[in-house]
């Protein structure tokens, strides 16, 4: 429940334009960032490659990465990983799914690969995370 609320807060902050001294900032970078974050929300279970998201915005991967980094201070892959980890935590804490089912829902080839991804991102295995939460 806490994570679901967190995802809503993050999404709300992302979608709202940035207030600057000269008014609202609707720069190209922010526009690309908002579309990217919406796409990550909609497609991260299917594709987690930066190239996929760059193609959706009709720009090269290199240019896309520069735009996202300038707008957010983060690399696109970091944003994708953070979202996938939040999604995974939410699914694990729901109690409705096993680790294997969460791996399948998130589009991982197998639960071992998902476990490695989760541990590298959080420092804990999915099982350890569920026991501690």
Where are these regions (language model features)?
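Basic, amphipathic alpha-helical hairpins
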Residues: 5-19, 35-49, 68, 72, ...
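Charge-rich, low-complexity intrinsically disordered segments
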Residues: 47-50, 54-77
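Residues within helix-turn-helix
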Residues: 51, 62, 98-101, 111-112, ...
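Core residues of bacterial helix-turn-helix
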Residues: 57, 106-107, 118
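Terminal helix-turn-helix DNA-binding modules in bacterial transcription factors
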Residues: 70-109, 131-133
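…primarily DNA-binding HTH/wHTH and HhH modules…
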Residues: 116-133
């Amino acid at each position: 429940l806490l994570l679901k609320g967190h995802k809503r807060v993050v999404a709300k902050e992302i979608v709202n334009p940035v207030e600057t001294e000269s008014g609202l900032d609707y720069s190209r970078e922010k526009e690309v960032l908002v579309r990217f974050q919406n796409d990550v929300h909609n497609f991260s279970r299917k594709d987690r490659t930066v190239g996929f998201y760059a193609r959706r915005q009709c720009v090269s991967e290199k240019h896309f990465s520069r735009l996202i980094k300038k707008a957010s201070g983060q690399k696109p892959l970091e944003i994708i990983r953070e979202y996938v980890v939040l999604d995974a935590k939410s699914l694990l804490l729901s109690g409705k799914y096993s680790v294997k089912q969460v791996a399948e829902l998130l589009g991982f080839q197998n639960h071992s690969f998902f476990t490695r991804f989760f541990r590298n991102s959080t420092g804990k295995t999915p099982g350890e995370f569920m026991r501690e939460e």
